[in-house]
Amino acid sequence: MELYSHQEKALKKMHNGCILVGGVGSGKSITSLAYYFNKVCGGKDKRMDPKKKRDLYIITTARKRDSHEWEGDMAHFLLSPDPTASPHGVKVVVDSWNNIGKYENVENSFFIFDEQRVVGYGAWSKSFIKISKVNQWILLSATPGDTWSDYIPVLIANGFYKNKTQFTREHIIFARFAKYPKIDRYINTDKLSRLRASILVPMKFERETILHKTFITAGRNEAMYQDCVRGIWDPFKNEPCVNAASACYVLRKIVNTDPTRRTIIRKLMAEHKRAIIFYNFTYELEILRDIMNEAQIEYGEWNGEKHQPVPKTDRWTYLVQYTAGAEGWNCIDTDTIIFYSLNYSYKIMTQAAGRIDRLNTPFKDLFYYYLAAPGIDQNIRRALNNKKKFNEEDFYNEEFIPF
């Protein structure tokens, strides 16, 4: 298997406990398998060193597991979850993060943790730390961490800290008068920077694709919007908004259901025969269904309830809910993504955009359309431009005027 030059460079730097960092579509999967085959198992000429070979466990998204995406890359190394198709005599397991707890007692194997989920200190992170103590492993990520706290599980797994308590004692200062534990700042960050540099293996490469990003201004019902802002009022339920989350939800529904968005989508679908459309809320999906049915455009869906494939017709749209489908799959049959509404998370937006920007895409030019209205959408966009997550509480405290 011949790798691209940027993958070869990364392979030489990889080591046990590292995070392979590559943009979406950079080929992290094939590079991680090359590391397992060549460095961990002493593979050469499609043969493993019998004394070095280890069973392989891949923890990935449910979608990647169910679509058998990993199996395509495994074939280059004669690896397969099917024992009859894997001549090396090693066990190969591909499963989702939801089931990581099932493998806490596995020892002397090699784990690839795909689409990093070990952020925070929940059940998945605790299972990951337990597995890391008795196995070799690497992590794959396009966006490894936004804050130092995101790195706690990986730093513990590498033996730099005994537990979260030690990390907190050495590096975190909490806000004095907060109602709940709130981080005010981090200290001794020089040490953290050195440790992070020792585990990150960047996979940099120059993309041949040209990205064309267009931000389209949608309208809003001004009267409804101002009534909500001034009175913290939900016009859909005719009752007060109970908190920042509900108030922001109402504002977003006001702008996302504005008729101008229908007009914009119809125009874009007239210009592009095939497109992926990302959305946040179920009411947006209902609007998009209506548009496609009216225009007689075939469409498929991927959300919490439906897992339909991408259509194979000449003209189609694929309606994808961010949480369900921002990562773990790709499509090289279209050059267009439309973001019907913006997601709060920079990480999710980046992952979503990468569904069409792959190494093997046949398109030179890729088109991205972002729909946004004045007001709350502008604030979300500002947070995304700063590579941060939109904060509803901050927006609520700044913008809303209660009676």
Regions found by a protein language model. Give the residues of each.
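A conserved SF2-helicase RecA2
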Residues: Y344-A353, D357-F403
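Conserved helicase/translocase motor-coupling segment
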Residues: E208-G300, G304
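Conserved helix-turn-beta segment of the N-terminal RecA-like "Helicase ATP-binding" lobe
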Residues: R63-H88, N158-Y161
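Conserved pre-motif I regulatory segment
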Residues: M1-L20
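Conserved P-loop NTPase motor "coupling/switch" region that bridges the ATPase
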Residues: K53-D55, F110, S127-R207, T361
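Walker A/P-loop NTP-binding motif
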Residues: K12-C18, S29-P50
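SF2 helicase motor core recognition
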Residues: G22, G27-S29, I100-V106, G120-Y121, ...
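Conserved Walker A/P-loop ATP-binding site and its immediately adjacent core
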Residues: T31-A34, D49-A75, D146-D150, F281-T282
